[in-house]
Amino acid sequence: MISLSDLRKFKAEGRKFSCLTCYDASMAKAMELAEIDTILIGDSLGMAIQGRDSTLPVTVEDMAYHTAAVRRGNQHALIMTDLPFMSYATLKDALQNAKTVMQAGAQMIKIEGGAWLSETVQVLTRNGVPVCVHLGLTPQSVHVFGGYKLQARTREAADQLIADCTAVVEAGAAVLLLECVPAQLGQEIAELFPNTPVIGIGAGNATDGQVLVVQDMLGLTFGRVARFVRNFMKEQSGETAILDAFKAFHAAVQDQSFPAKEHTFQVEL
């Protein structure tokens, strides 16, 4: 089973690691067979599974249910679970809700924010809960951002994001996840923290790992497709097409053919 120590080792060795969202046991088993390194039970299930307009209505109970299903289907990947909207607004809530999803099978929890999360990260870490902090475009704050848009477009904004990363890493964050930021910034942050694995989605190909929503990479997105998405399913055929798509994603992350330049945001900072 992949562990946090393995992710750190991968980074030290320069080996890129793969991450996909997953919400059920059958997909989890296919990801195990494809040797996907990390699985994120994301609150994206609100849209991908429940058909909602955003992640905001997702509950801790939802997250625990899907975490348990994924864990039963996959004994290989590191399992990371989102704490959903407003479920870590207080330290008491953060501890209780982290306990719930960890007992369901998560090995790490993910929360969205910046430097203001430092105390929460510190308390969770001291209580034995590894924490991934999601920065850049954070979907739980979509109404604050005014939509799903590229973040840290200027040097000033990029430096603020770096300061946020520094604060949460110093507080004990085990992993960083960057979403929708310039490729240059993704590289800067990955290089700035040699002992902290950095996962990217729309953050360039210099981050240590890459994550996609499974429905997106299987071509099950109806409507606008994000720039950072590649449809790995259309390259496959036959009864093993889904498994082959997962294998292709894993291989493309490792050899850095994904994300290609067309999947990234090239902004001079």
From Swiss-Prot:
Keywords for the protein's UniProt record, in alphabetical order: Cytoplasm, Magnesium, Metal-binding, Pantothenate biosynthesis, Transferase
InterPro entries reported for this sequence: Pantoate_hydroxy_MeTrfase, Pyrv/PenolPyrv_kinase-like_dom, Pyrv_kinase-like_dom_sf
Superkingdom to which the source organism belongs: Bacteria
Statement: the UniProt record of this protein carries the keyword Chloroplast: no
Subcellular location per the Swiss-Prot or TrEMBL entry: Cytoplasm
Manner of cofactor binding, per the entry note: Binds 1 Mg(2+) ion per subunit.
GO CC annotation, single: cytoplasm
Gene Ontology process terms (BP): pantothenate biosynthetic process
Binding site for Mg(2+): D43, D82, E112
Pathway membership, UniProt: Cofactor biosynthesis; (R)-pantothenate biosynthesis; (R)-pantoate from 3-methyl-2-oxobutanoate: step 1/2
Positions contributing to 3-methyl-2-oxobutanoate binding: D43, S44, D82, K110
Root EC class: transferase
Keyword Thylakoid: no
Catalytic activity annotation: 3-methyl-2-oxobutanoate + (6R)-5,10-methylene-5,6,7,8-tetrahydrofolate + H2O = 2-dehydropantoate + (6S)-5,6,7,8-tetrahydrofolate
Active site, renumbered: E179 (proton acceptor)
Functional note: Catalyzes the reversible reaction in which hydroxymethyl group from 5,10-methylenetetrahydrofolate is transferred onto alpha-ketoisovalerate to form ketopantoate.
Name of this protein: 3-methyl-2-oxobutanoate hydroxymethyltransferase
Organism: Acinetobacter baumannii (strain SDF)
Classification lineage: Bacteria, Pseudomonadati, Pseudomonadota, Gammaproteobacteria, Moraxellales
